[in-house]
């Protein structure tokens, strides 16, 4: 007869499992996940331990989705994130202390992946109120890193840089966290890009790419190539940007990294429209739309429709306004600023200064929203 396994021994294994998740060590994390799952049925009754397991399984899947699509990896019996989230939500009322921290932190990570940035900040702020229960310095670095990502997407540059610095200082003290270190370099770079400090941005992107290449991580290699292209694009160096986007697309397609393809195809499409290379733009536009539909990416589908409204429909101002309303409803103010600039420049280049002026005014209004954005994140916890 098989003996009962103590919950403390399984708890130690879950801690070890989480260590491998944070290191992005998929084989070790998968091995422990399967082992722990088998042992749970033989474990003494402990509801908190079952909750801890559910939270860690959710975090495990977030790691897998970040690095490689589950469909490509063909990992057996891997539950969907949405199903895991539903299961954990049902048990939320029982969460206290460290488990409550994990729930809010992991849920914030999920919302961040869904590009629901304000919702992500809300959960991260709740997690921050429970950070007192976290004794592990690497876990604190994880929290700082995700806060930095969130503030970057909301264009709160100095908040993002400060959290990235705190995370980097911890990660560099520990071995086996090279992936997070290279991601910190990417965060520094993207924030420098927003500050228009292009040389600093390129330096950090190149460092990140070298590290991603050494780690043999195609997702991170592709993203870094994309970001270097983005840096060139931001300086209106369109011809220089194109090769980087092509290389990023090649990496994503070769490795079947579907979620990253709409973004890469969008910018290479937009560049070709700006350069007046309409036939090539159509080709990229078609592929980008197809990948967006396949990925179920509603935001990029709407962005490809925006390109059609601006460059192929006259422009269609009603459709453009509808797109702007959509971005505003999602609080995607940084994206709204960029697209309003594109429309303003479109009209300015065609010497329609009245309409250009109206859209430049829109840009200023959006910048006011971004600059005043800190108050949006003062969320009661």
Swiss-Prot record:
PROSITE patterns: TPR, TPR_REGION. Induction: Part of the rapF-phrF operon, which is controlled by ComA. InterPro entries: TPR-like_helical_dom_sf, TPR_rpt. Disruption phenotype: Deletion of the gene has no detectable effect on expression of the srfA operon. It comes from the Bacteria. Mn(2+) binds at residues 40, 43, 45. Keywords: Competence, Cytoplasm, Manganese, Metal-binding, Repeat, TPR repeat. GO terms for biological process: establishment of competence for transformation. Gene3D superfamilies: Tetratricopeptide repeat domain. One of its GO terms (molecular function) is metal ion binding. It is found in: Cytoplasm. Its main location: cytoplasm. GO terms for cellular component: cytoplasm. TPR repeats lie at residues 101-137, 148-181, 182-215, 222-255, 262-295, 337-370. Inhibited by PhrF, which prevents RapF-ComA interaction. Interaction with PhrF induces a conformational change in RapF, which is propagated to the ComA binding site and causes the dissociation of ComA from RapF. Pfam families: ANAPC3, RapH_N, TPR_12. Changing residue 27 to A: Significant decrease in ComA binding activity. Involved in the regulation of genetic competence development. Inhibits the activity of ComA, a transcriptional factor that regulates the development of genetic competence. Acts by binding to ComA, leading to the inhibition of its DNA-binding activity. May also affect transcription independently of ComA. Contains a small N-terminal 3-helix bundle domain and a large C-terminal TPR domain, connected by a linker region. The 3-helix bundle domain and the linker region form the ComA binding surface. A RapF surface mimics DNA to block ComA binding to its target promoters. Interacts with PhrF via the TPR domain. RapF and PhrF pair of proteins acts synergistically with RapC and CSF in the overall regulation of the ComA transcription factor. Belongs to the Rap family. Monomer. Is monomeric either alone or in complex with PhrF. Interacts specifically with the C-terminal DNA-binding domain of ComA. Interacts with PhrF. This is Regulatory protein RapF. It comes from Bacillus subtilis (strain 168). The lineage of its organism: Bacteria, Bacillati, Bacillota, Bacilli, Bacillales. The gene is rapF.
């Amino acid at each position: 007869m098989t003996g009962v396994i103590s919950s403390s021994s399984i708890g130690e294994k879950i801690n070890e499992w989480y260590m491998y998740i944070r290191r992005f060590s998929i084989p070790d994390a998968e091995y422990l996940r399967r082992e722990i799952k088998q042992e749970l049925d033989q474990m003494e009754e402990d509801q908190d331990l079952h909750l801890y397991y559910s939270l860690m399984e959710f975090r495990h899947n977030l790691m897998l989705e970040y690095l490689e699509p589950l469909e490509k990896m063909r990992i057996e019996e891997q539950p969907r994130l949405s199903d895991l989230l539903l299961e954990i939500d049902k048990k939320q009322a029982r969460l206290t202390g460290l488990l409550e921290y994990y729930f809010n932190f992991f849920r914030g990570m999920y919302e961040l992946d869904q590009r629901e940035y304000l919702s992500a900040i809300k959960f991260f702020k709740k997690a921050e109120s429970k950070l007192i229960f976290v004794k592990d310095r690497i876990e604190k670095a994880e929290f700082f890193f995700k806060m930095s990502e969130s503030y970057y997407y909301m264009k709160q540059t100095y908040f993002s840089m400060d959290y990235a610095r705190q995370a980097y200082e911890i990660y560099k003290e520990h071995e086996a966290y090279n992936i997070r270190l290279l991601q910190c370099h990417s965060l520094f770079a993207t924030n420098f890009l927003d500050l228009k400090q292009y040389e600093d941005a390129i330096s950090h992107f190149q460092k990140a790419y070298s590290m991603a290449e050494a780690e043999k991580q195609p997702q991170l290699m592709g993203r870094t190539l994309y970001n270097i292209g983005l840096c060139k694009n931001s300086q209106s160096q369109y011809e220089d940007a194109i090769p980087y986007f092509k290389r990023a697309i090649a990496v994503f397609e070769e490795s079947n990294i579907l979620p990253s393809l709409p973004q890469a195809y969008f910018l290479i499409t937009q560049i070709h429209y700006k350069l007046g290379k309409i036939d090539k733009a159509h080709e990229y536009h078609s592929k980008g739309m197809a990948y967006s539909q396949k990925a179920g990416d509603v935001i990029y589908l709407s962005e490809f429709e925006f390109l059609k409204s601006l460059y192929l429909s006259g422009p269609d101002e009603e459709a453009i306004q509808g797109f702007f309303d959509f971005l505003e409803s999602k609080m995607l103010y940084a994206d709204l600023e960029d697209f309003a600039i594109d429309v303003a420049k479109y009209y300015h280049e065609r010497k329609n200064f009245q309409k250009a002026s109206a859209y430049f005014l829109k840009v200023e209004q959006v910048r006011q929203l971004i600059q005043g954005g800190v108050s949006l994140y003062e969320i009661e916890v």
